[in-house]
């Protein structure tokens, strides 16, 4: 089937694109210890902490039966509608820092932008927001008006006026 073949070939291309930072990092001839290596570890660690904290906060919030049908606004979810995706993106942001000494290092600075486009427009957020609007309706619309979609920012007023 040509459609299935095309689908799987497209996935293979995306896997190759998303693997480039790790490959370039491994090709870096410098020994570990440059300031960019430590910056990469700090950014990656911050992303991991953010993603794990957001997932844990959401899981704890969902366990409370009183929250059924409502939107989580606790913890990081007060500042971003998708703090877990933001944390994941921070982890992707770390890879180009780690690969700066490799031949592809500077080109890989574009990689986090590609990941950001995927999260904001193609894979993560659009699908999640559609499902949230279907399941939580007006509560989620108010949350959308008050809360940044991706980057953690102070909340705006939920009043639509």
Where are these regions (language model features)?
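Interfacial transmembrane-helix boundary/kink motif in multi-pass membrane proteins
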Residues: 1-10, 35-38
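Hydrophobic transmembrane alpha-helices
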Residues: 15-57, 61-161
């Amino acid at each position: 089937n040509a459609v299935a073949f095309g689908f799987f070939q497209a996935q293979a291309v995306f896997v190759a694109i998303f693997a480039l930072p790790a490959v370039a990092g491994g090709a870096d001839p410098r020994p570990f210890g440059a300031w960019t290596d430590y910056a990469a570890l700090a950014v990656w660690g911050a992303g991991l902490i953010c993603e794990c904290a957001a997932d844990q906060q959401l899981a704890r919030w969902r366990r409370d039966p009183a929250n059924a049908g409502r939107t989580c606004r606790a913890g990081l979810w007060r500042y971003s509608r998708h703090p877990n995706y933001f944390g994941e993106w921070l982890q992707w942001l770390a890879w180009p820092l780690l690969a700066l000494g490799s031949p592809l290092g500077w080109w890989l600075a574009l990689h986090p932008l590609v990941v950001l486009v995927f999260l904001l427009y193609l894979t993560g957020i659009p699908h999640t927001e559609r499902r949230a609007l279907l399941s939580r309706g007006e509560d989620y619309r108010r949350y959308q008006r008050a809360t940044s979609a991706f980057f953690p920012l102070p909340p705006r007023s939920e009043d639509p006026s």
